[in-house]
Design a protein with these regions (language model features):
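Well-ordered secondary-structure scaffolds
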Residues: 1-131
């Protein structure tokens, strides 16, 4: 079957002389250390872990009792190294939890909730807890 193409278009010169013989390099920083802002919209959260704590992927690490807030969970398993102010998008300093990956894949996800047996309050609490 003949492939469909468009007539015309823009065909700028490639100009890849500088890079055509270079190998591809990973320029992104290692994910062995992550910095997770404790507030990601809504009311500010407070850390519920401390420096030196071991955390699992999916574990809640910050929360707030305020109406408009969502808890924050760890994206990696590892050890909490720092809890400090760090710049985020817009060069605004926010409280962050710094976690060093320990190489394990420990998880701490919630067990599924049975919709046939849970109450409305249990379901709402679970949704809020999940962030």
């Amino acid at each position: 079957m003949k492939s469909l193409t468009f007539k015309g278009g823009i065909h700028p010169p490639e100009r890849k002389e500088i890079s055509e013989n270079q190998s591809i390099e990973n320029v992104f920083p290692s994910t062995k250390i992550v910095s997770i802002p404790v507030t990601q919209g809504g009311a500010p959260n407070q850390p519920i872990v401390k420096i030196g704590d071991s955390v699992s992927r999916g574990q809640k690490i910050a929360e707030s009792d305020a109406f408009m807030s969502a808890p924050v969970h760890s994206s990696i398993a590892g050890t909490v190294k720092k809890i400090e102010m760090r710049p985020v998008t817009g060069n605004i300093d926010v409280l962050c939890i710094v976690i060093e990956d320990d190489g394990s894949d420990r998880t701490d996800f919630m067990e599924p909730l049975n919709p046939d047996t849970c109450t409305k309050d249990e379901a709402l609490a679970r949704v809020k807890d999940a962030g």
